[in-house]
């Protein structure tokens, strides 16, 4: 048997940025496909529009900065950022929402700080928060899951809705489910019902919760979980941040549910609602804006999990992940400063 010989140093080859971004994007596709299946063509339209704007914006900035355009665009980082923005906003949001958000993410959050590897905030989440604060109506107008829609939207109707060829009166028809109730995310629905004095049990009796978690959202989270596990298998991401988030969110929500089940949703609902699995595996694990040491990553993830629970339970934004991740991004340098990896040659007890 012939063996391949190589001279020292025998170093493990790290994945290049292009390969990492491509693998993350491919692993996110099951989640995107699930969103498309349950919520229609708008998901794909928003993603494709975001990718187009991201590439054009990055090319324009690179030209102004006199940096190589083709080689930089080929690292796929702009595509991944655009994908995350596209799946995070309502599928029938006006076209200019995703355009403004994508330009903000690429030009301001990414390149204003020096480009890839220099940004202190996650670009996709910074853009999402900016859009949510600036355009709350458009960012909370979610479409009805196709299985609950009074009038499902095909591709033509979706394009008309996104690009402004549909009157607000006609568009409102597609925002109502078969029970006549305007749709929101399951977390939004629970939050609103609790503010009206309903119990969790009463809220979960609505049509949107016919599968126990929120029609469509459970399987979307399962799809992103599958993609996340694939990334762990491929060693694209480290496990500490994801485990830290899930553990902290599970523990906090379990205590809340045990203390007051009428006003606190259970841990499984927390884990499989909203953008939980998308954020846990595809957003919070961004190595540029996260802590770097093993213990630091666990603390970073735990901080996000606690913040998500607190904001979801007591704050005004039910999903909470975008705010939690940005706050954790602020804390990452502090975590790295005080929690450093052990250096080689360290003697136990010294």
Swiss-Prot record:
Pfam family, one: NQR2_RnfD_RnfE
Protein's GO biological process: electron transport chain; transmembrane transport
Subunit structure: The complex is composed of six subunits: RnfA, RnfB, RnfC, RnfD, RnfE and RnfG.
UniProt function note: Part of a membrane-bound complex that couples electron transfer with translocation of ions across the membrane.
Residue(s) carrying FMN phosphoryl threonine: 185
Main location: membrane
Keywords per UniProt: Cell inner membrane, Cell membrane, Electron transport, Flavoprotein, FMN, Membrane, Phosphoprotein, Translocase, Transmembrane, Transmembrane helix, Transport
Name of the protein in its database record: Ion-translocating oxidoreductase complex subunit D
Entry membrane topology: Multi-pass membrane protein
Transmembrane segments: 36-56, 68-88, 89-109, 120-140, 212-232, 239-259, 265-285, 291-311, 315-335
Keyword presence, Flavoprotein: yes
Cofactor(s) of this protein: FMN
Family: Belongs to the NqrB/RnfD family.
Assigned EC number: 7.-.-.-
GO cellular component: plasma membrane
């Amino acid at each position: 048997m012939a063996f391949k010989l190589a001279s020292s140093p025998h170093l493990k080859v790290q994945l290049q940025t292009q390969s990492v971004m491509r693998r993350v994007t491919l692993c996110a596709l099951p989640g995107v496909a699930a969103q498309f299946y349950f919520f229609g063509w708008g998901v794909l339209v928003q993603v494709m529009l975001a990718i187009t704007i991201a590439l054009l914006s990055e090319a324009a900035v690179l030209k102004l900065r006199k940096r190589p355009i083709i080689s930089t665009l080929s690292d796929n980082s702009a595509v991944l950022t655009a994908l995350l923005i596209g799946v995070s906003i309502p599928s029938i949001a006006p076209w200019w929402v995703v355009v403004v958000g994508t330009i903000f993410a690429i030009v301001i959050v990414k390149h204003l700080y020096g480009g890839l590897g220099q940004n202190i905030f996650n670009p996709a989440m910074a853009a999402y928060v900016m859009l949510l604060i600036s355009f709350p109506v458009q960012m909370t107008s979610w479409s009805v899951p196709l299985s609950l829609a009074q009038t499902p939207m095909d591709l033509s109707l979706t394009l008309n809705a996104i690009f402004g060829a549909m009157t607000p009166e006609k568009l409102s028809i597609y925002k109502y489910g078969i029970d006549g109730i305007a749709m929101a995310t399951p977390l939004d629905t629970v939050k609103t019902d609790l503010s009206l004095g309903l119990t969790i049990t009463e809220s979960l009796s609505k049509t949107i919760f016919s599968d126990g978690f929120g029609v469509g959202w459970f399987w979307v989270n399962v799809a992103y979980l599958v993609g996340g596990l694939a990334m762990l298998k491929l060693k694209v991401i480290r496990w500490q941040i994801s485990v830290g988030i899930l553990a902290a969110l599970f523990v906090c929500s379990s205590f809340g549910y045990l203390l007051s089940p009428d006003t606190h949703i259970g841990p499984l609902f927390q884990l499989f609602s909203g953008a939980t699995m998308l954020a846990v595996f595809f957003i919070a694990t961004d190595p540029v804006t996260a802590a770097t040491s093993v213990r630091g990553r666990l603390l970073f993830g735990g901080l996000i999990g606690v913040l998500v629970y607190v904001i979801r339970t007591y704050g005004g934004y039910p999903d909470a992940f975008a705010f939690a991740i940005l706050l954790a991004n602020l804390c990452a340098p502090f975590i790295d400063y005080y929690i450093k990896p052990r250096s080689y040659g360290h003697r136990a007890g010294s």
